[in-house]
Regions:
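Polybasic, low-complexity association/targeting segments
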Residues: 68-117, 243
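Domain-level detector of nuclease and nuclease-like folds
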Residues: 104-270
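Hydrophobic membrane-insertion alpha-helices, especially the h-region
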Residues: 14-29
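N-terminal, intrinsically disordered, polar/charged segments of Gram-positive cell-envelope systems
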Residues: 31-91
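Alpha-helical interaction segments
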Residues: 16, 55-56, 78, 122, ...
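N-terminal Sec-pathway targeting helices
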Residues: 2-15
């Protein structure tokens, strides 16, 4: 056997060390790269899931059909808002522009106590939202006006904001703002929706910061909304709801394509 010199031994040790170092670097690279790839695969999945939850809610609401005898409202997401109170950016309101059919879209309000107010006299409303046909009907012997100009964000919660939703001290509220009005049944407005509006008013009057979103749900190209999706959450935890309210009226049937209506004494709303 040939005896290795000390110089040859050093060369061999150096070569082995290099190989080990290269292998270690590769393994280290893989150890770093694989968790990164795994994480990058998880993040889009989570984002898609979060986005689809909201979209799924709206898709399901679009598919709902009210039948005589049903309840006028139902909870969405078990009645819990999906809004994030930590993203409050107010006081302001973000209105949607009118769409190609001239229909109103969602409005998201970031409200405080300074947005609550009352005025001694309200200006008249001249704007006619899509589907506006408020001719009186005789229902069960009574004269009924089936529609209201419904506010997405209630008039008394829009003080000190202009019609674009930006802060403007001294403004007396959004009365006749096309981006805040839709054709709403008088029953859903005055009996049902008003209950939730009062919950929001109570919260901001107590000093809470409230994130509040309201969206009319239209089907296809219909001019009158089938319902109203409303949710709100406060920074103090005193307010949290998520509800869908059908745009219906006892004793009245609406043609949602046009907003016209006819009396039907057998049409029931619970």
């Amino acid at each position: 056997m040939t005896k290795l010199s000390s110089r040859d031994i050093k060369k061999i040790i150096g070569a082995v060390t290099t190989v080990i170092a290269m292998g270690g670097a590769y393994l280290a690279k893989e150890a770093v790269a694989l968790p990164f790839l795994h994480k990058s695969n998880e993040t889009p999945s989570k984002t898609i899931k979060q986005g689809s939850t909201s979209n799924q809610d709206k898709t399901e609401l679009n598919q709902k059909e009210f039948k005589s005898g049903m309840a006028i409202k139902e909870d969405v997401n078990s009645g819990k808002s999906t809004l994030n109170p930590s993203e409050w950016v107010g006081p302001k309101i973000t209105y949607s522009p009118l769409d190609s059919e001239n229909r109103v879209g969602a409005a998201t309000a970031y409200l405080t106590k300074e947005n609550y107010g009352k005025s001694e006299g309200r200006e008249g409303q001249k704007w006619s939202p899509t589907g506006w046909h408020n001719q009186a009907l005789k229902v069960n012997g009574k004269r009924v006006f089936p529609q209201n100009r419904g506010h997405l964000i209630g008039y008394t919660m829009t003080f000190n904001l202009d019609n674009d939703g930006n802060k403007k001290p001294g403004e007396l509220g959004s009365i006749d703002n096309p981006k805040n009005l839709f054709s709403q049944s008088s029953y859903s407005n005055q009996v049902t929706f008003q209950t939730y509006e009062e919950m929001v008013r109570t919260s901001i009057k107590k000093g809470s910061k409230v994130t509040y979103r309201v969206e009319p749900i239209f089907k296809d190209n219909e001019l009158m909304a089938r319902g109203l999706w409303a949710q709100a959450v406060s920074d103090t935890g005193d307010l949290n709801f998520n509800v869908y309210i059908y745009n219906v009226q006892p004793g009245v049937e609406f043609n949602y394509s046009t907003g016209t209506s006819k009396a039907n004494p057998n049409f029931e709303v619970k």
